[in-house]
Curated annotation (Swiss-Prot):
Localization: Cytoplasm
Subunit: Homodimer.
EC id: 2.4.2.7
UniProt key word Glycosyltransferase: yes
Pathway(s) this gene product operates in, as recorded in its UniProt entry: Purine metabolism; AMP biosynthesis via salvage pathway; AMP from adenine: step 1/1
Location, primary (coarse class): cytoplasm
Family label: Belongs to the purine/pyrimidine phosphoribosyltransferase family.
Any one GO molecular function term: AMP binding
GO cellular component, one term: cytoplasm
Protein name as annotated: Adenine phosphoribosyltransferase
PANTHER family: ADENINE PHOSPHORIBOSYLTRANSFERASE
Catalytic reaction annotation: AMP + diphosphate = 5-phospho-alpha-D-ribose 1-diphosphate + adenine
Gene source species: Shewanella baltica (strain OS155 / ATCC BAA-1091)
Pfam families: Pribosyltran
Length: 184
C-alpha cells in the first residue's frame, strides 16, 4: 500500500461496508457504494490519488466499467487529462477493439474506442477493486494494442488473497491500493 495518512486511509476503509453472502453464499462483498455515500471518504479517496499521481506525466486515465468510472473520471479532471471508459461489448458508439478474459465460469470481454488512446499516451488504469486481475489484464492489453504505455494501476480496494496483485505485477504494472482486505 502507498505511504499515506493513516487516519485518512482508515476513514476510507471504514466507509466500505462488508455484505456477507452476496452475491452468493460464502462471499464477503466489499460494497464501495457505501464509500460513495460518504462525501468525506469519497473526497479523501480522490484527493489521495491526485496527490500521489500529480506531476507523473499521465496523458490519459482509463477506467473500467462501471465503478472504475466513479474514481477514474474525477481523478482525470483533477489531473487535467482525458478520461477513457473501457466497457462491456456493445456499449461504445464508435469503432472499437475487444479483448476477452476468463471468469470463474466462462468468459467475458471488454471494448475500447480505437481512437481513444494515441500511440505513446502515458496511461493510468483505475478501478474500484482488484481481485483476480482479469479485468485489468484485459484493459492493459487493449491499451497496449493501441500503442499506449501503461505501467501503473490504482485501486481503492485490493483482495490480495485472490492473486490479482501478482498477476498484474507480472504484466509490469506498479500498483497503488488504498486499502486491503486480506483472508476474506
Amino acid at each position: 500500500m502507498m505511504a499515506m495518512n493513516t487516519e485518512t486511509l482508515s476513514l476510507i476503509k471504514q466507509s466500505i461496508k462488508t455484505i456477507p453472502n452476496y452475491p452468493k453464499e460464502g462471499i464477503l462483498f466489499r460494497d464501495v457504494t457505501s464509500l460513495l455515500e460518504n462525501a468525506a471518504a469519497y473526497k479523501a479517496t480522490i484527493d489521495l490519488l491526485v496527490e500521489h499521481y500529480r506531476g507523473q506525466g499521465f496523458t490519459k486515465i482509463v477506467g473500467t466499467e462501471a465503478r472504475g468510472f466513479l474514481f477514474g473520471a474525477p481523478l482525470a479532471l483533477e489531473l487535467g487529462v482525458g478520461f477513457v471508459p473501457v466497457r462491456k461489448p456493445g456499449k461504445l458508439p464508435r469503432a472499437t477493439i475487444s479483448q476477452s478474459y476468463e471468469l470463474e465460469y466462462g468468459h467475458d470481454s471488454l471494448e475500447i474506442h480505437t481512437d481513444a488512446i494515441n500511440p505513446n499516451d502515458k496511461v493510468l488504469v483505475v478501478d474500484d477493486l482488484l481481485a483476480t486481475g482479469g479485468t485489468i489484464e484485459a484493459t492493459v492489453k487493449l491499451i497496449r494494442q493501441l500503442g499506449g504505455e501503461v505501467k501503473h494501476a490504482a485501486f481503492v480496494i485490493s483482495l490480495p488473497d485472490l492473486g490479482g496483485e501478482a498477476r498484474l505485477t507480472a504484466l509490469g504494472l506498479e500498483l497503488v491500493k488504498l486499502c486491503e482486505f486480506e483472508g476474506e
